[in-house]
């Protein structure tokens, strides 16, 4: 082999090696949608969903894709919302308690960008600085499980006591519908009342079921809002939960706590499928892929949509 050929071959091998060591697991592909509406329902375990009382969610499920997914262990809130927004496993994001305000175990240095783990909001900001994003939530822990300063709009709706969650969740919808005027690439509507009333009265109780019904009414408002904003044909709806429950508790190692609903719906996903098993860690990578953005290697979840 001539020297020039050897040099060319070595250069090609080096290039492949460099690509393999890239910070990005997937190269960007053409987006399939312009917008993702993410609905996060705390404590909404798949085994506890009163489908016959939730027509709006049922319509999204029946008109789209559905999988019974799995969350991370322990089956608690901060651990699993971090799993969803950072798109990675507990061993990487390091959140270990239900109310962790920051990683309890330092994330691997190789996974950090600017000293922090990349989340779905920070990746959109990094790759597309002009994109508008919004995150709205009633449990303050949500703000600690994502890089809220990367979102164009972030608001926590505080209030005292378990019974304050239903009106606060409604406030999330009220403000979120206003945010649709900005045509956000990604908007999070978080709902906390299902978890709150599950703790207060038990998963599967009448008050728990009533909370699910109210959340379904809020989902209906979101759907109508997307239509009125002229975003319907270009929007993917995604609904996930952080955990289920049993009695008045969660954090347990059983399917009542592990199994969560994953709904992906909208015109852009017609003819597609979800690759199972779907994990909660797949949330952020799937959203980034839908919008045509790169998925960083730090996100150990995968794009679950094919």
Where are the model-predicted features located?
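Bacterial N-terminal signal peptides
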Residues: 8-19
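Active-site nucleophile/metal-coordination loop of metallo-enzymes that catalyze phosphate/sulfate
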Residues: 26-33, 45-126
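Loop/turn elements at helix/coil->beta-strand transitions in domains of secreted/extracellular proteins
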Residues: 32-36, 63-66, 127-134, 182-187, ...
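Metal-dependent active-site segment of extracytoplasmic phospho-/sulfohydrolases and closely related
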Residues: 38, 56, 211-255, 287
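Active-site rim elements
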Residues: 69, 107-111, 208-209, 269-277
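Substrate-binding rim/cap in mid-to-C-terminal beta-strand-loop elements of soluble/periplasmic
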Residues: 85, 253-294, 305
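Catalytic-site neighborhoods of secreted/periplasmic enzymes
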Residues: 93-97, 112-165
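Active-site His/acidic residue clusters
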Residues: 141-158, 174-217, 221
């Amino acid at each position: 082999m001539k020297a020039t050929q050897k040099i060319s071959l070595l250069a090609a091998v080096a290039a492949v090696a460099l690509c393999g060591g890239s910070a990005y697991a997937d190269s960007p592909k053409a987006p399939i949608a312009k917008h993702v509406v993410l609905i996060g329902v705390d404590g909404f375990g798949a085994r506890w969903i009163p489908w016959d009382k939730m027509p709006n969610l049922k319509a999204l499920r029946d008109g789209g894709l559905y999988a019974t997914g799995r969350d991370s262990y322990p089956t608690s809130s901060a651990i699993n919302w971090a799993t969803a927004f950072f798109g990675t496993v507990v061993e990487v994001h390091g959140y270990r308690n239900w109310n962790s305000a920051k990683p309890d175990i330092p994330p691997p240095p190789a996974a950090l960008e600017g000293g922090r783990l990349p989340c779905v909001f920070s990746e959109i900001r990094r790759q597309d600085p002009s994109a508008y994003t919004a995150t709205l939530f009633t449990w303050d822990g949500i703000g600690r499980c994502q890089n809220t300063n990367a979102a164009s709009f972030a608001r926590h709706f505080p209030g005292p006591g378990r019974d304050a969650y239903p009106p606060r969740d409604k406030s999330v919808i009220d403000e979120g519908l206003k945010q649709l005027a900005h045509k956000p690439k990604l908007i999070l509507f978080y709902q906390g009342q299902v978890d709150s009333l599950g703790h207060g009265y038990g998963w599967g109780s009448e008050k728990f079921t009533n909370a699910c019904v109210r959340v379904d009414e809020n989902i209906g408002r979101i759907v109508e809002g997307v239509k009125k904003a002229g975003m319907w044909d270009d929007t993917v709806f995604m609904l996930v939960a952080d955990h289920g429950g049993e009695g008045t508790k969660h954090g347990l190692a059983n399917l009542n706590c592990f199994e969560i609903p994953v709904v992906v719906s909208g015109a852009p996903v017609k003819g597609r499928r979800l690759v199972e098993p779907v994990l909660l860690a797949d949330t952020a990578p799937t959203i980034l892929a839908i919008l045509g953005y790169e998925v960083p290697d730090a996100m150990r979840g995968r794009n679950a949509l094919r």
